[in-house]
Design a protein with these regions (language model features):
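Structural alpha-beta junctions
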Residues: 69-71, 130-134, 176-179, 221-223, ...
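Active-site catalytic microenvironments for nucleophilic, acid-base chemistry
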Residues: 124-128, 200, 286
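C-terminal substrate-binding/catalytic lobe of Rossmann-fold NAD(P)-dependent oxidoreductases
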Residues: 1-40, 132-142, 146-270
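NAD(P)-dependent Rossmann-like dehydrogenase/reductase catalytic/cofactor-binding core
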Residues: 245-320
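N-terminal Rossmann-like NAD(P) cofactor-binding subdomain of oxidoreductases
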Residues: 1-148, 295-299
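Buried hydrophobic packing segments
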Residues: 118-125, 170, 280-284
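Conserved strand-to-helix beginnings and helix N-cap segments that scaffold or border functional pockets
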Residues: 61, 119, 208-209, 277
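A generic structural signal for alpha-helix starts
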Residues: 116, 203-206, 275
Length: 320
C-alpha cells in the first residue's frame, strides 16, 4: 500500500493503479472525498518493510515514532543523515558497491540520485584503474525540480550550493580517504542532472576508448554519442513509452569525453528520481528476502527492462 499525507490527485492515481491508500489517523477527514483503505498507523502494524519517502529529516522522526517500536524494516531516502544524533542508519546503499552489506540490516539509507549516479560511474573506474587514479573532481549540475513537480516555480537563476553533502555521502561507502572533490550548482531545468567528472591519473591517462570500454557491459549505464541536450533523452523515453519517461540509468555523453595528459574528463546525465527507484527495489530484496546480488538484479531487470532500454538508447543515439 501507499501512505499519503496530502489529499491531491495522486490519491486517485494510486487507487486506479490498484494500490491501497492509507492516511494519517488525525487527517482522515481531509480525505473524505477519496476511497481510502484506512490509517497509516494500522497499516504499519501489518507491514514487513517501509520505504520512507517523506521530506528530509522527517524520516528520522518516523523511525523513532513508528518503525522502531514495531520492529519494521525501513528504507530511507537521500534527504536523511547517516552521521550524528539524527542518523537513520550507518549504511548508505549503492547496489554496485555494498549490496551484501544491506543483508540483515533493519534500517538503511538509499543514496540520493546524484550520489547513486556518482557511485555507478566511480565503481567501474575504481575497479579497473584503482592503483593509478590520483583524484576525482566532480561538478554536479543539478536540475531544479522533477518533471512531475509542475506546481513548483523554477526561478531564472543559477543557485550555488555551499558544502554539498554528495561527496561525503559517496565517501561513506568508498572510504573517508577517497580523493573525491565535489562542487554543485542548481540550474533552472527539470531535464535531468548533469555531472562533469575529471579523473586524474598518476602519469599518462588511459585512452578515451579504454574508458568507454569499461562501461560497455555495465548494467544501468548507456553510452550515447549524438545527444545534443538532456531533453533529447527524455523525449526519446516518452516516444517509446518508458514508464514516467524514465530511463532508470546513467547516460555517458561519449562525444564529450576528453583526454588531456594525466586527466580524463567524462560528462554524463543522471535520470534523477528514475535512477533511485530500481535501487530501492534492489535494497528491499537484500533486506526483506536476503537475495543474492545476482538474484535481486534479475528480478529488478524484469520490472524495469533496463537492458532493453540501454539497447534502444545506444542504438538511437549511436555514433554518426
Amino acid at each position: 500500500g501507499v501512505g499519503k499525507y496530502s489529499p491531491d490527485s495522486k490519491v486517485n492515481e494510486a487507487i486506479a493503479k490498484g494500490f491501497k491508500v492509507y492516511v494519517p489517523e488525525k487527517n482522515q477527514n481531509a480525505f473524505s472525498d477519496f476511497s481510502i483503505s484506512g490509517n497509516i498507523e494500522s497499516a504499519l502494524d501489518e507491514s514487513d518493510l517501509v520505504i520512507d519517502a517523506s521530506p528530509g529529516g522527517q524520516g528520522f522522526k518516523n523511525k523513532k515514532l513508528f518503525y522502531e517500536s514495531r520492529d519494521i524494516l525501513s528504507i530511507y531516502q537521500g534527504g536523511e543523515a547517516i552521521d550524528g544524533e539524527n542518523a537513520v542508519s550507518n549504511l548508505l546503499f549503492n547496489s554496485k558497491v555494498n549490496y551484501n552489506d544491506a543483508i540483515g540490516k533493519k534500517h538503511v539509507m538509499q543514496g540520493s540520485c546524484n550520489v547513486t549516479g556518482m557511485g555507478r560511474i566511480l565503481e567501474p573506474l575504481r575497479k579497473n584503474f584503482e592503483n593509478s587514479i590520483k583524484r576525482f573532481d566532480v561538478t554536479l549540475v543539478r536540475r531544479w525540480a522533477d518533471i512531475e513537480q509542475t506546481g513548483e516555480t523554477i526561478p531564472d537563476t543559477i543557485e550555488l550550493t555551499q558544502n554539498p553533502h554528495h561527496g561525503e555521502d559517496v565517501k561513506s561507502y568508498f572510504g573517508k580517504n577517497t580523493p573525491l572533490f565535489v562542487r554543485a550548482i542548481k540550474v533552472p531545468t527539470r531535464q535531468m542532472h548533469l555531472h562533469i567528472m575529471d579523473v586524474r591519473f598518476n602519469g599518462n591517462a588511459p585512452s578515451v576508448d579504454d574508458i568507454h570500454d569499461i562501461f560497455k557491459n555495465e548494467y544501468g549505464i548507456a553510452t550515447l554519442w549524438s545527444v545534443k541536450g538532456t531533453k533529447d533523452i527524455r523525449d526519446f523515453a516518452e516516444k517509446l513509452n518508458f514508464s514516467f519517461k524514465d530511463t532508470n540509468m546513467i547516460h555517458i555523453h561519449a562525444n564529450m569525453t576528453q583526454k588531456i595528459d594525466d586527466t580524463i574528463q567524462i560528462m554524463y546525465s543522471d535520470d534523477q528520481t528514475g535512477i533511485v527507484i530500481p535501487e530501492n527495489h534492489m535494497l528491499l530484496q537484500a533486506m526483506l528476502f536476503e537475495k543474492s546480488y545476482e538474484g535481486a538484479a534479475k528480478h529488478t531487470e524484469k520490472l524495469f527492462n533496463m537492458s532493453e532500454k540501454k539497447r534502444l538508447l545506444e542504438s538511437n543515439f549511436a555514433k554518426k
